[in-house]
Amino acid sequence: MKPALVVLIVAMAVLAEGYASPASDDPLRLPQEKHLRNIRQLSNGGENAEAYFSGDGKQLIFQSTRDGRACDQIYTMNIDGSDVRMVSTGKGRTTCSYFYPNGKRITFSSTHLASAACPPKPDFSKGYVWAIYPGFDIFSAKPDGSDLKQTTKTPGYDAESVISPNGRKIAFTSTRDADLDIYTMDIDGKNVKRLTNEIGYDGGPFWSYDSQWIVFRANHPKTEKEKADYLALLKDNLIRPTTLEIWVMKADGTGKRQVTNNGKANFAPYFFPDGKRIIFASNMDDPKGRDFDLYLINVDGTGLERITFNPTFDGFPMFSPDGKKLVFASNRHDKVQGDTNIFIADWVE
């Protein structure tokens, strides 16, 4: 997910009202959050989001504006919040970081080759939009940030990259064919294959634990007016993300199936370790669309259950490799209103 969308979603969320009291024995957990225990806050201050586990479950990689930075850079830390290190270049804007399963390298997207400065913010005169920066390319590096290598070199937007658990493929989002679609490629950037081709935004892919399926978010305009609006925004490297649904497909792009159908902003889907359920973020229960919470749903669209009840923002969930812990980003317990921080919790079925 792009940093601009993170900021916009959080800005909407902090306007929500009606805080519930936390559970007395677990001060960061609300009483209704029965699947979460022992919630711990790992970051403090600024915008911190999209934290993902290393293959051994001992580290997290995430994006942050800490240290007074104007736009996100990539950091790693231990799962107790210690040993925070910046591993990107410190230039441009970065997003969508992920560990290789063997822990030997990381991947992330960056605009630093296009410009060392932060790219301009999107034009909000066009409404609720976020930027698809064409300067984004995908890179890999050692976990300490050294040995930086460029993976994609195609003109346009290449970002939202994730490594398959078997370590063989990268799924990512690109505008290389004049639309926002999901592709796969080998770890070295070769053998690129387009998986989606319906007009509209297909992005934010994540793999199932067996590397056989991909879950993603999508918005496919239906009417000619909607299509024209989408294409006009895309021409200006913008997208309007107010309606996103969760989809799944096989790793080769076949078997596409829509999972949610609520007309809201559903994003950041991630498979449960059992491969039968998906956890994701949505504003479906807030008529004003400001409050984002975590939900689980079966891959066939049944069994919807709300997981978090924080009245501002909870998003970007990911399970640890053993399925025992959940990491997510939240505004709960923010010292400065609107600050987004990283939290980790024990998962309880």
Regions found by a protein language model. Give the residues of each.
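Blade/loop signatures of beta-propeller domains
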Residues: 21-37, 136
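Beta-strand-rich domains and repeat architectures in extracellular enzymes and scaffolds
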Residues: 27-29, 37-70
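Predominantly a core beta-strand signature of beta-propeller blades
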Residues: 38-39, 82-85, 128, 146-150, ...
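A flexible loop/linker signature enriched in serine peptidases of the S9 family
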Residues: 44-47, 64-74, 89-94, 109-138, ...
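Residue-level detector of Asp-centered blade-edge/turn motifs that repeat once per structural unit
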Residues: 55-56, 101-102, 165-166, 209-210, ...
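Hydrophobic beta-strand positions that form the internal "hydrophobic ladder"
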Residues: 60-61, 106, 170, 214, ...
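Short loop/turn segments that connect beta-strands within beta-propeller blades
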Residues: 78-82, 142-146, 186-190, 250-254, ...
